[in-house]
C-alpha cells in the first residue's frame, strides 16, 4: 500500500522545467543552517502539480515565474524540525504527531522570480523567517513587496490552493484531506517510480 501511495507523487521538474527550484532544505540556507535533503527535488501529487503549473502559467503573463522552496517533505524531516526548535518557536512548524500537508505531497512553499532578470523578487519577509512579517496579511514593509506577495497568492488561490495565514509562501491544495502522510526519502520515491 505504501509503495502505491508513493507512486502517486510526481517530480515537478518533469512537468514544467521553467518552474524554478531553490530547494532550501537541500542547502544550508534554511532555519537549521544545514542540509536535510540529499537532493534538491520537488515532488507533489499529480493533481497538485498540475494546479501549480497552471498558477505558473498565470504569473508568466505578468512577467514572473514560480520559485519553489519546498514541496513533498518526508515525515521524518518534519519530526527533525519539531525536535530542533525550542518550544516557543514550534508554532512555526507542523506537529509531527499529525503530520503536515507537505508530508502528504499537497503543500508547496513558493515565491516568484522575475522572468527578465531571473532573480528572486523581494517579499515582505525572507522565506522561513519566523516572525510576524511572514504572515500572509502582514501590512508593513515595502508596498511593492506586498503587491508581489498578493500576486502570488491570487495566482495560487485561482489554481486551487489556500495560503497558510502564518506564512506568505506556504500554500495547501484543496485536495489535501484525501492524501495520506508519507515518510519516504526522495531516493525511495525514485526507486518506486522505476517500478512503474
Predicted regions located by residue number:
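Conserved metal-phosphate-binding beta-hairpin within the catalytic cores
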Residues: 171
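Short, well-ordered surface patches within globular domains
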Residues: 77
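Segments that shape or occlude catalytic/ligand-binding pockets
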Residues: 74
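Extracytoplasmic cell-surface/polysaccharide-interacting catalytic and binding patches
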Residues: 4-71, 81-166, 174-196
